[in-house]
Amino acid sequence: MKKLDKTNNSNKLSYQKDGTPYCQRFDDIYFESESGYQQSDFVFIQKNKIGLRLQIAKQTFTVAETGFGTGLNFLLTLQAYQKAQQVSSFQLAPLHFISVEKYPLTKEQLVQSLSILPQLQSLALTFINSYPDCPVEEFGQEFKTTFFNGQVRLTLIFDDAAQGFSSLNCSKEGLVDAWYLDGFTPAKNPDMWSKDLFSQIGRLSKDQATLTTFTVAGFVKRQLRDIGFRLEKLLAKGKKKEMLSAVMQSNPITNKGYYLRPLITKPQHVSIIGGGIASACAAYALTKQGVKVTLYCKDTSLAQGGSSNAIGALYPLLHQQEDDISSFYQQAFWRAKALYTEIAEQGFSFAHQWCGLLEVSYKEALIKRQQAFESLNTWPNELIHGVNAKQASELANIDLPYGGLFMPNAGWMSPRDLVKQIFNAAKSTTRLKIMTDTHITKIQQVANPSSNENGTSWSLTSNQGEFNASVLVICGGADAIEIEQLKSLPLTATRGQVTSMKSNKKINKLSTVICHKGYLTPENNGIHCIGATFQKNDTNITTNKADDDYNLTMLTKCLPELSSTIDWQEQDISSSKARLRCMSQDHLPLVGAVPDIKEHVATYSHLAKDKNWKYSQAAPCIDNLYVLLGLGARGLCSAPLAADILTAELCNTPYPVDSQMLFNLSPNRFIIRDIIKRKIKS
């Protein structure tokens, strides 16, 4: 490996009275002793959403940095990975941290500089022990090491920033997920902030890559815009008052303008119509971003619709091979489990158990399906794996004659309690106002109010009077289908009835959720839940005996031995509940701005002749009207990730999913597909 070709690469440091490391070459400090940890954590870790993105990453997550300096940002990222792994029940995807440093510090300088950061001492010691123990002049061109049994890789390139990054290879999809533009300011270190550097940043960035930096210099902003970043200037912390946050909007998306979501100024206030799991997750995510929220719930109390069941199962919808549906639900599942764990750890308790879920292979078609899962091995074992009848019986703690597919990280919870506690967590921010017994029956657009910097607002008509919403999000489940502005969306209401059964000594030891054509949950408060029916074109939520009989019959038909052992009779029914699900055509939620159908047809009409026709025009949408709908029977799984996507759209923060998945969830996907299939004439 070649040596550094610079003749003066050593860095002379001095230390201020409080221990702050000071660089004589650039006449500036590396970080402040009192607030450096908090400042860097806020700008680079929090504003890039590193912790969340590490939890949901499917492939190696790559961070690139200009100016390694003392290694503070790397250690913060290492700490974020450690914390994310601690709250995760599965092995995180690997992390690769790449940093370019023209003037590296010696091991002795690192020891002294990092000694004033007690929050990072353990990780700092591990890092320093692996660092080159020789003069800077003898460093190679790069240094590599690993942490956490190889899960985290560090690549340090000792070179000029632009030159160092030019040595990296990447595919057309890009390499870097998040950028830390650190190093000293353009005024102090102008050579680093070159046009060549920004060209490399553009070349290496993935679609939706994020970037943060302390500098807000005009030159930097212009260069970032030129290479495709969307910018937002934010308040920083400590003595550094401002910062930049940016998201890459790359060329492949602009070839399909209908993939682009509308940009709005982050609203100070958002109104939500709902009361169940979707609105709870949306309210929580928005209030955590500093947005004030008013919730309008038609019922006298929360969680009275589809989220009102006593027990519900949380598990992903997976197919043998990875496809759009499976890809979304596996990511949504991990996000849901992380959020619900977070809520519980904050002290907002709800009945739940991570006991796993068993999909029983009770017939030949399901046996073949299980064999396909096992042979293809598409998914990691911690998500799903096959078990035989003996293993299934041990997992369930009851005798089962069949094997099946086991999801060890799945479980059950009380949706009703969970929803209320998520709302309580949102209320603890003091940014949530809840108005129950307020049924919004009509919404009407109000043009150009002076109070709304995003343009039009909405007038809401209810049984409690008129209200105004600057930005409106509709999460009202099946009720939303009746709102005039949403009738063009292909949503349907499907009735479902769940039956609660009294436990007995033959089934009370059940220790995992069982799925067949229906499902059977473990005992909670003396009951088990079985279900559920699926009835289209039926909006009557009055319970009936026929549906209870159906739920019991399905258990008997699919698992006759178990049903015979339990011996449930009609008198063992504790209660029943019927509610409506809001379903989409493709079994994926609808998240985002409501499309203007007429403008879509006018704008994208040539897709009917050439589906690959390139458009730069962003999707025309109805101003300030958003939905989080179509969660169907899987709201527990899909709501948290969908809420994160909605919040990213409203707050101009990085999306937690890629551009293709964004389109797969976009409310305009149906009209685009219909234009391509020539179902709609322009």
Swiss-Prot record:
Annotated region described as FAD-dependent cmnm(5)s(2)U34 oxidoreductase, given as residue ranges: 273-682
Q: Which residues form a coiled coil?
A: none
What EC number(s) does its UniProt record assign?
Answer: 2.1.1.61, 1.5.-.-
Q: Which Pfam families match?
A: DAO (PF01266), Methyltransf_30 (PF05430)
GO molecular function terms here? flavin adenine dinucleotide binding; oxidoreductase activity, acting on the CH-NH group of donors; tRNA (5-methylaminomethyl-2-thiouridylate)(34)-methyltransferase activity
Q: Classify the main location.
A: cytoplasm
Which Gene3D superfamilies does its entry note? Answer: D-Amino Acid Oxidase, subunit A, domain 2, FAD/NAD(P)-binding domain, Vaccinia Virus protein VP39
Cofactor(s) demanded: FAD
Gene Ontology cellular component list:
cytoplasm
**Localization terms from the record:** Cytoplasm
Q: Which UniProt keywords apply?
A: Cytoplasm, FAD, Flavoprotein, Methyltransferase, Multifunctional enzyme, Oxidoreductase, S-adenosyl-L-methionine, Transferase, tRNA processing
- Which Gene Ontology BP annotations are present? methylation; tRNA wobble uridine modification
Task: Tell me which positions the record assigns to the signal sequence.
Answer: none
> Could you tell me what reaction this enzyme catalyses?
5-aminomethyl-2-thiouridine(34) in tRNA + S-adenosyl-L-methionine = 5-methylaminomethyl-2-thiouridine(34) in tRNA + S-adenosyl-L-homocysteine + H(+)
Q: Where is this region: tRNA (mnm(5)s(2)U34)-methyltransferase?
A: 1-249
Protein family according to the UniProt entry = In the N-terminal section; belongs to the methyltransferase superfamily. tRNA (mnm(5)s(2)U34)-methyltransferase family.
Role this protein plays:
Catalyzes the last two steps in the biosynthesis of 5-methylaminomethyl-2-thiouridine (mnm(5)s(2)U) at the wobble position (U34) in tRNA. Catalyzes the FAD-dependent demodification of cmnm(5)s(2)U34 to nm(5)s(2)U34, followed by the transfer of a methyl group from S-adenosyl-L-methionine to nm(5)s(2)U34, to form mnm(5)s(2)U34.
* PANTHER family registered for this protein in UniProt: SARCOSINE DEHYDROGENASE-RELATED, TRNA 5-METHYLAMINOMETHYL-2-THIOURIDINE BIOSYNTHESIS BIFUNCTIONAL PROTEIN MNMC
Q: What is this protein called?
A: tRNA 5-methylaminomethyl-2-thiouridine biosynthesis bifunctional protein MnmC
The source organism is Colwellia psychrerythraea (strain 34H / ATCC BAA-681)
